[in-house]
Amino acid sequence: MRLLILVIVLIDFCYLSAQEFTLPEDTEVWNPVPKIVDTFDNLAPSDAIILFDKDSLNNWQKINGNPADWEVNSNIFTIKPGTGDILTKQKFSNVQFHIEWRAPRLSGESGQNRGNSGIFFQERYELQILDSYNNKTYTNGQAGSIYKQFVPLVNASREPYVWQNYDVIFIAPTFNDNGSINTRANMTVFHNGILVQYKVILEGATTYIGKPKYDFHNNGSILLQDHGSKISFRNIWVREIEVP
């Protein structure tokens, strides 16, 4: 008898559940309404912050706060070796980031000495720039790697002096009130349109020697590294994004 009652109750429950959604409109969501972002071929989207477009490094500065003094010419700018890193004046958290870069032709150079630079998100987490076209080096230090942490899924590098691009989703770490890590940073990277990193969970800030680790920090700038190579850049933009 108890079993019969249970079966009847279950049948009634399933019937009532089925009656909850009887029209297509019952499962339609109308709010919130996503904001409109205009998009264009080979141009930044309408809500992007333009970090470099044509002929000015006004959005950048040196680490000591002095004006960025890399060479600007014909809508591109090029590292002036020995002058030091530059970083954005604005600080960021989670971002979608686009950059185009070009390695010089360097005869006789190989490994890490061939077209080396890097993009440091929040001044700490490095996406490596390197001429990795027919250039052997440690694989967690080639183009598309999260330096000394994650090897790229593939090598999508083009020949030297051919323009390349990165499209990056960087999700910043969060910290507890006592400064300890709450959620670690993660990064997704497309190199020349090819997925090379997918939601990799960063082990900490980039280090050349030793293991990476997290130390408390707030939002930070995007830094471009002077590693002694005349890497050129153009069409740099960023979108601030919110994540649940």
Model segments located where?
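Bacterial Sec-dependent N-terminal signal peptides
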Residues: 1-19
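Carbohydrate-interacting regions of secretory-pathway proteins
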Residues: 18-244
